[in-house]
Amino acid sequence: MKNIGININTDKDISRNILDKIFQYIHEECSEAKIKVFYDSKGLDNEESRALDAVMVLGGDGTILGTARALAKYDVPIFGINRGHLGFLAEIELEDCKKAIKNLFKGQYKIEDRIMLKCDLKGIDKKDDFLALNDIVLTKGNLSRIVKYSIYVDDVWYTTFVADGVIVATPTGSTAYSLSAGGPIVYPDLDVLEIAPICPHSLGIRPILLNGNSKINIRVLKKYEDPVLTIDGQRYKKVTVNEVTISKSEYKCRLIKFKDKDYFKILRTKISYRSRECEGE
């Protein structure tokens, strides 16, 4: 492992001193290592990134999401040094950075392949790659009016309801927006997709888990303005068509996970149960 990328979120508190220390830690483990620095994911999606052995992300979970989308086509593994708020995906804290880099070069890690989503807009030429690691969300526009949606799974009608929107999430995204919409926490290596309605106007409409190979069609039956498509909470596009198709992408996000990290501990402390009675012994 000699070609290392570092993707920096310039909105975070990352001083030159921090970066110099990271350079030092890397060269202590491999004096011949070549390091390429990226800022705010610019240039990460270029073909040259295919040569990288790993990318370290200095930022928060949002920076991880952007990095994952940029590198998805190149099969480059990533891990995050948390400089954000939550740090669920970017799970390495700054004080543990040296240890993580040492373990990286010693090969003391595993790689988790995480499902990603793709989205096609019916009747529109594919000019953009709508890839998502967390979720793809179709919602009403700015008006405070609900929209009527009809959901088809593998071309079979599932249900129709009125709601503020619809979330289609991966297992990775199950701890994000869909969790707030009442969806379950899904273990990250499961091959499933989740549909979670946002504020449905019916008590009987609940989130559902589907086979990961399912094709999900969302048809907008009644609208007062063009709905909005949001990718990982970061990319935003007004939708002028009445049907959106969401399915599993052929690309995956490759997350580097170090052996001393426990998913359930991270879940307890950062997502699920922030109370003394659940801290354990």
Curated annotation (Swiss-Prot):
Listed GO CC annotations: cytoplasm
Domain of life: Bacteria
Entries under Gene3D superfamilies matching the protein: Probable inorganic polyphosphate/atp-NAD kinase, domain 1, Probable inorganic polyphosphate/atp-NAD kinase, domain 2
Annotated GO biological process: NAD metabolic process; NADP biosynthetic process
One Pfam family per UniProt: NAD_kinase_C
Reactions performed catalytically: NAD(+) + ATP = ADP + NADP(+) + H(+)
Annotated positions binding NAD(+): D61, G62, N134, D135, R145, D164, T175, A176, Y177, S178, L179, S180, Q234
Family membership noted in the UniProt record: Belongs to the NAD kinase family.
HAMAP family: NAD_kinase
Protein name listed in UniProt: NAD kinase
Source species of the chain: Clostridium botulinum (strain ATCC 19397 / Type A)
Highest classification ranks of the organism: Bacteria, Bacillati, Bacillota, Clostridia, Eubacteriales
Name of the coding gene: nadK
